[in-house]
Amino acid sequence: SFSCMQFQDLGRSNHQNVDLLIKKVYKTVKTTRKKAVFGVSPAGNLDNLYLNNSYYCDVKKWMSSTGYIDYICPQIYWTFTHTVCPYKATCKRWANLKRNKNVKLYIGLAGYRAGLSKAQAKAVYDIGWSKSNTILKREVLYGRSTKKVSGYVLFSYADLNRKAAAKDIANLKKVFK
């Protein structure tokens, strides 16, 4: 029978396997091209990342140690008013994690959620997306205020030209001028 102890061992084993994979990919990238950068873009909810039965990634280890990643880009795809992972608190948690001086923190922003209707925002459990067209801009400004965020990644490129997102994208562009 599959005991609780075996499950814990399986979780530990899966964590070790993912750590080894990340370390080996990093080494392969650096061996192939020394100046290339390698990073990961995990889900933004740190609590979920550390559940023992799903992601199996130790982002704290990867960020604080050498030989794993050059950057990390958590997907913080929520507004400031999200009930589980409000942007400000989630960004702050990531920014305050211990980090090797060579590991950059980029924040993944949800361009694909910009301009959602009220019904669409309700469907993703984040009504804030339907209430403001300055969310992405404010998220960048908050990240900058931490002095710990090195940049931003917008998902996805297609949303730069999506009509419903036009106001959000125009406001976002203002902070990059």
Predicted segments with their positions:
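Polysaccharide-binding and catalytic clefts of secreted carbohydrate-active enzymes
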Residues: S1-S65, Y77-W78
